[in-house]
């Protein structure tokens, strides 16, 4: 199946008060454990990453898991965006974080999620 979760910035501030120095507009999480569905959207996802000019920050490959963190630079009308993909044998998670933060802030946030 597919599970979608949206967390707005106000809830994040309430849940993580020690992260008040960063400005997160929202976090969107898509959890996919349907291989057919994932294969059908993979090409579209790769094209979106290319079109939106995401840059890879980190990529790790473990024996059973791949993690990739990409960043889209902010423009005058849009804040920064991060896309985190976590792929394992069982499922894949796509996590979009929209807001202004440094790499160190992102690492701190990910440890809390």
Which residues make up each language-model segment?
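Short, low-complexity, Pro/Ser/Thr/Gly-rich segments in the mature regions of secreted, periplasmic
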Residues: 102-112
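Short Gly/Thr-rich strand-loop-strand
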Residues: 46-74
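Extracytoplasmic
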Residues: 2, 22-24, 62-64, 78-79
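Surface-exposed flexible segments
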Residues: 37-51, 95-98, 106-107
């Amino acid at each position: 199946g597919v599970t979608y979760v949206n967390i707005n910035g106000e809830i994040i501030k309430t849940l993580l008060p020690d992260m008040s120095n960063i400005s997160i507009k929202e976090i969107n999480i898509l959890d996919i454990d349907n291989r057919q569905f994932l294969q059908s959207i993979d090409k579209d996802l790769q094209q979106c990453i290319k079109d939106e000019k995401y840059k890879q920050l980190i990529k790790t490959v473990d024996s059973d898991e791949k993690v990739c963190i990409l960043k889209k630079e902010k423009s005058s009308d849009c804040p920064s965006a991060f896309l985190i993909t976590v792929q394992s044998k069982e499922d894949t998670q796509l996590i979009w974080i929209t807001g202004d933060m440094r790499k160190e802030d992102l690492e701190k946030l990910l440890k809390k999620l």
